[in-house]
Regions:
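Short Pro-Gly-centered flexible turn/kink motifs
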Residues: 243-254
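Beta-strand-rich interaction surfaces with strong enrichment in secreted/lumenal proteins
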Residues: 177, 239-242
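Carbohydrate-binding surface patches
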Residues: 157-197, 203-208, 250-251
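Flexible loop/turn segments at secondary-structure boundaries
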Residues: 1-7, 49-55, 106-112, 151, ...
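Acidic, Ser/Thr/Pro-rich beta/coil linker or hinge segments at domain junctions
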Residues: 196-240
């Protein structure tokens, strides 16, 4: 969680997640080599999510209360950026991470909230939903050249977090990307010459000027994804040129 109110370091948490998965995979492979084993151990990454907003609130709960409002984190926009990056991390490791269940789905540290009078989507719902719908197929070994920054906890962290997923059956390619810079838009180029005949279907962006912006029952669409303008992404001669706004989650879909 972002206890220190340090967004730069908070967004680098996905690098810690990436390093953790790589470390566990390395240990599994080292034991396999030492034992001359043939079985590859795959991973389950269980009960993941951002969780810290409700900690202080829950300390005030009385004991033995019926159906208390417990662990009801209200997620803000920067949480959505991190969840988007965590999903990218899990996709990058899809060769070994075969199951990755989000902790809970409704009310308790969840993307969906309810009350006695309604239900609404939290900020983290959108990268989760869109990645689930369009992040299907074969995860490509996405080589990303990006500037880095020094985070307080995780060392060097990339400004650009990205992965590509190819759906061969539907002749569709989806690019997921997070620009973690808090100050600058990012111009990105991507070599897609192997995807001849593909065209941009849509460029979806999740962004907000206020990193602390939240969705509530009264304002359920304060933070929602929108279609980026045509000037934000173009594909010519097998080269994709795109602009990712500062502190934004992006999804570019291409298809024949």
């Amino acid at each position: 969680g972002n206890y220190a109110n340090d967004t730069v370091d908070f967004l680098a948490s996905s690098k810690g997640m990436d390093d953790f998965i790589s470390g566990v995979v390395s240990i599994c492979d080292a034991v396999k080599a030492k034992k001359h084993g043939k079985k590859q151990i795959n991973l389950s990454f269980d009960e993941w999510n951002v969780w810290y907003h409700s900690n202080e609130q829950d300390k005030k709960l009385e004991k033995w209360v019926q159906a208390p409002h417990q662990l009801e984190d209200v997620y803000n926009f920067e949480d959505a950026l991190l969840v988007g990056s965590m999903l990218i991390t899990l996709l990058r490791h899809a060769d070994r991470v075969k199951i990755a269940c989000m902790a809970q789905l409704v009310n308790v540290i969840a993307p969906i909230m309810t009350s006695d009078t309604g239900a609404w989507r939290q900020t983290i719902f959108y990268p989760y939903m869109l990645t689930s719908v369009f992040g299907r197929g074969t995860v490509l070994n996405t080589q990303v050249l990006t500037p880095v920054y020094e985070s307080r906890t995780y060392g060097e962290a990339p400004y650009l977090d990205s992965v590509c997923v190819w759906d061969e059956e539907k002749d569709a390619l989806t690019i997921f990307a997070v620009n973690k810079s808090l100050d600058e838009d990012m111009e990105v180029s991507c070599d897609l010459r192997q995807f001849e005949g593909y065209k941009i279907v849509e460029h979806i962006v999740l962004n907000n000027d206020d990193l602390q912006a939240v969705n509530t029952e009264a304002q359920p669409e304060n933070v929602v994804p929108v279609k980026a303008g045509a000037e934000c992404s173009k594909l010519e001669g097998g080269k994709l040129e795109a602009v990712f706004a500062k502190h934004s989650w992006n999804m570019i879909r291409l298809a024949k």
